[in-house]
Amino acid sequence: MKRFFIVILFILLVCIFNVKSEEQLGEIEISKNSFSIDTNAINAEINYVIDNSITKPKLIVTLLSGDVNSIEDITSISKDKSTLTFGDFSSLSLGNKQSNNNNRIVLMIATITGSLLFIRFNIGFNKSTTLIILIIGTIFLIGSSHSITLSEVSIRIDIKVPSTFKFEKLDLKLGSGSSNIIGLSSNSINIDSCLNLKDHKINLSDTTITSALNICSTKNIDIKNLKQSSNSLINLKTNSNITLNFGNGYSGLLDIYSNSLKIDEACDIKVDGLNTTGSCNEGTSSKLVINANGVTITGTTPTTTPTTTPTTTPTTTPTTTPTTTPTTTPTTTPTTTPTTTPTTTPTTTPTTTPTTTPTITPTTTPTTTPTTTPTDSCPTTSTWRPTMASSSSPSSPSFSSVTPILDFNFDKSNLGFRSRYKFNEKSISDGPNGIANSFSINFNETYSPDSNWLISKIPSPALRANVNYVFSFNFKLGQALSSDNTISSVTISFYSPIDLPDPNVLEYFDQPTASPLFTKTITTGSFSSSTTFQANSISIKPTTDIGLSLIAIQIIRTKQNSIPINLYFSEMKLSIPSKSIIDPTTFLTKDSELINIPKASASFDSQDPSTCPYLATDLVHWHDKSIWSSGIVPLPNASSNIILPAGKRVLISPCSISQTDIYKKITIPPTSELIFSDVNMTMHVQDIYVQGKFTMGTKECRYNAYINLIFHGTKTTSDTIATNFGSKGIAVASGGFISVQGKQYHNTWSKLSTTAWSGDSTIYIQDSVNWEVGQQVLITTSVYKDELYNQNEVLTIAAISGKKIQFTSALKYYHYGGQEYQAEVGLLSRRIVFQGDQSSSDPQQFGGHVLVSGEGQFSGLSLVRFGQKNIKGRYPLHYHLANNVQKSYISDCSVIDSYYRCYTIHGTNGVTLTRNVAFNAIGHCYYLEDGVEVDNTISYNLGAFVHTIGTPAAGYNQYGQDFLQSSDLTQPADSAAACYYITNAANSFIGNAASGGWSGFAFPNLPRPIGNHLSVSIVPSQFIAKVWEGNTAHSSGYYFEFGASIYVGGLLTYNDATGLLQYSSGRESRDTYLTGYNTSAAVWMRFNNTKVYLSNRGLSMWGERTEAVNLESHDSRRPASLFGEAWLSNAIVNGQSGNILSASVEYTRQGFQFYDTYVQTIISNIIFRNFIKYQNASSNEEDNRVIISMTHSSEFLPQGISVSKNITIQNTATSQFIGHNIPVNSTGSSRFFNFIDWDGSLTGKNVPTLIGSHEKFWQFDNTCSFNSDWNCYVCTKGTREIANVQFWVPGLISRDDAQNNDDSIGSISLFGDGITDRRSTRVIHTAGITGVSNSGWYLYLTDGTPTYMKIWLAQVIYNNYLFIAIPYPATTTFSVSSEYKYNSNYNFNFTQTSSASAVRSGDGKKYYFDGTHLFIKVINFRLNGTESFDRGGAKVYDVYWEFLIHITASNTIKPPVNGFFKGLTDTLPSSNL
């Protein structure tokens, strides 16, 4: 019995206390450069360790005390893998929990069973033993339950990184514990242990920062050997003591609040109570802010050059200012330190979805309840000024000599699952909890296919031939290995996107029909483990360069599954290896071969510091309570409207205001002015109303400080600023003035001077720039379909010198920089930033806005998360009904991640909009609103990545789609959003670039103005551009078959009855006049020096008058589509450039398509090159041909409407010169296709040449030969011209009842001139016969010849004729006459002559009937030889309205039946005529 109770006692101790020793819970890989750890709910000991045995950073979590079974019980990682939170998550890890409980239950059962056996054989059963058994069972049941008590849990977190690793941002939100951080390198570090006032001691040693260090702690802060850049910001707060030692010296400003202070003698300080301000070593850039009881600062004298990479624009903002300050910390928050200027752009390429979360984060979490009294330490004397910012740029470090390894990561978010059947949206899901970058493939149904595909949703990087790349992944089975889940092979392939199904759309898929660009299969991978992830890798070495492609991964199992199975993947990636950086030996010396693209002046704006507004002697300080009527400096709060004192010029300095709390509204009265100091500062605000003046720099005193205005407010349509001025922004009333002018960076954008490949970290541009380390740079796409395959990239400058830029990370994609065209490279960062607060802006796309109804001057300003989607008038930067301005401009600004437009000119004339950049905007970007805006200059701007609102306009024919104004589409033309939206062309457009958008430049047709100007009596679409010079557009036009990068089309109208706008996206022509009024001369809309590339149609205008002179088109489906009287001259049309991304069968290219009816088109002085045959073309029109026909219809028939002259064709097979299509179902437009090669340069005949279709009707003499490659007759033109007549037969053929019906009702044949064979073409119900003049045409109608017909001489040109023969029965008599509808002097009655020959040689007023045929010679007597469209030494003759020939026939012997003479023999007239 004694032995029994000893056993029981042991069991009790094990079950009750269940004590665990120190235990490693697991590892978590850190996959993001910006990472956040939140241990606020748990006691944590944090160590930062340099470990060069690893290549990637990771966390090791060790349990020191408490009851935790799995790392998954206490951790949760965000979906983007950037935030790790510690807490009680045991309810989310049911699998592990259940498994542990099961283990406990098994142990319990085993122990009870053992006890029963022990009792049975050693003691025997009785009442006492039964009770003991019950006690044992209860104890084990208690022990088998499992819950986590966080207060009892203590962990150690070891952050291990290789010595070369640098964080972009590291955030630590800490509870109790301690941190010992040694060797950390980061752009910014934010450590906050103040949130719950828990004690956490912080020690830092050998730490390097380049932007900001923010620490808040209730315990001591000990920092040794801190290395910081010359522009870093250091903010330390604690109830206890601070020891701070600098490893590279300290030069900069001080702002310290402390009970005691020991500081180096090299610092010049001023002590006012507990406040100490000043600077060390005359430094001004860095900023040191400390709140503490005791401070010791050593090493302030610089002794060495900082080793860190300097940055002037911190890429993050401090977030550690506690919402609850330590209990012993003074209530004054230092305010002379800005919270840092935020990154103005995404650190990664935006997705193709325009509503992605923008990338600028607010500097702090502001409150509307004031937490500070900012004015206590600010002098109020009139002469006092803070130390103003310097214009100096940080020195660039040396360039790295190698590129970093670049990994393309794949996971659930960017892969689509496809199979033959049995799959859905749940077939791919998140991977196991706690496993970074993992996903699961789920075969939830039995007998799922044994093969499936993972198809990438994002384009692959460009791959060079003969370079080794690695595709790798870790793999684990979800169930133990069996025949159900055995992997037989994994194949990695690269396909052209058009050869794969859309990975965003669920659809069944078996195998691609096309061959891959590259493929490789492995059959011997590590695919057997169900307990641990095993590494797999595949070496990839393409034999040719691979441009635009998608990765497709095929996974094949040995058989279909009989049970549900899961396959787990982690760390799937394609790696581009590191390589040495070797500077190219040659660079582009010009950006174009032919055209001239003007550039902005290379000079900087002249500066005169003596004029700086903060130097004025009549200023008063915001923080001077004596200027306020209440005698109190106004504090920020949720409801106040701070009205500046009337008649005062108020200077605002960092110490004047709270930089963390929100100012509800600031009003500047008409006689007042608000002037900002040129000092780094941040201000949170909702509304600013300017009736007087708002000044933040001037043209001659551009500010150098980092000034950050953050606008707050949830979505509303209320006017909280002022009536009609909306909410959340700055509004300048009529009569008001605003000037915001930051440091000038020039050029604001350039172009590549050599191609940049995926994996490159260094680029070379065409212009020297003064950009700075740490700034953000955009490189635009080099693909055709910008929105579908987003390859725009935003990177951070690591080093820079002149035209060479190196980034902190490698390029993901290929960016072309050949002679034909080059990707644009734009600077996004500015020192002055206006941004929408992310938390209130993102959810409903409701950012800030700036509206100016007075005069406004802006330069060096960045606007981020601005614009309010679908709210009219709420745009990022907007001149609003300012009429004629005299001194307003927007220069070298940037708009980034806009919710609605970029730069708007509305009811305002005389604005200069120049050298600006815009990126990632919803709706039209550069926007002329109502159609009355004229005399503005829009020059040297860049717009990129512009998104439509709603479904992009498409359509199945030339007329596109109709869109009606709605709450989801306030301006229906946003369905075709353009980089530049031009409702009135009467402005100057010089040197602008458009990348992406539905179109690059859109000229919608407005029959009258809209909006506020409905009553203005002009027709906006009748105006021509004042200047169009040197503009470029690319990567657009692809949503609509007839869309273009420069699109002059569409119709925007206002319905007076409904009060709604309507937009039709398709065909709409425009008449243009010299003054814009139809009482003046008709003029041509001219486009000079234009470049289009990667376009659907480069330039499209539906008519009526167009000239495009000096044009380059590269990699476009067609360079231009021009209607009406159109001239394209002096051009290079290049079917294929050196850009490997465009070398795809995604689309074919044609040099020019001649239209099919009623236009006049001349192309002259054109070089066509690189039209390479596409073997799988469905027709000649779809092949890569230089000239193609339009052959789709029998309703629209061509006349003589097309001429070419001085054509040069290079690197193109002769077979590709012309591509005439013969449809399977014949069409009239195909039969009558023709054009004149004016000088024979295109066909190579070198004499004027006539090209006609495949019909023998075009074989008019023995100079004609049929070219089987072209499907055309090619003839020496001689004295012949193209002629067109229309036979109008009542009830049979009518011009007014054109039909797309190609049924034959007869034929027309050549006769005379020695022709004995049939050279004919069919006649159909649609009126119109086109052929060669000065020839015999014989008309035969199958159902007989009518008693009456008209012949319209649409195109029988001056000094030309047609000799027409028509069969009639013998004894028929005739009345033949001519009629000119508009002048009876040309009306003649024909007389009968003696022979057919006499008719042909006669004056055109005679006829002859030989008993079988009526012969007439038709001449248009009205013509005088001036009826033509002439350009470039060539001409296209007019279609002339309405000269008619009437023929009336009667016969009493063989009378007609129902108006037709029947039974006539089809006999060709004599060949001798």
Swiss-Prot record:
Primary subcellular site in the record, as a coarse category: membrane
UniProt-listed SMART domains: G8 (SM01225)
This protein's record includes keyword DNA repair: no
Pfam families, sorted: CEMIP_beta-hel, G8
Keywords, comma-separated and alphabetical: Glycoprotein, Membrane, Signal, Transmembrane, Transmembrane helix
Residues annotated as domain G8: 626-754
GO cellular component, one term: membrane
Subcellular location: Membrane
Composition bias, Polar residues: 376-389
Record bears the keyword Acyltransferase: no
Start and end residues of each stretch annotated as Disordered: 298-400
Transmembrane feature ranges: 105-125, 130-150
Low complexity: bias regions: 298-375, 390-400
Membrane-protein topology: Multi-pass membrane protein
Similarity annotation: Belongs to the comF family.
Protein name: G8 domain-containing protein DDB_G0286311
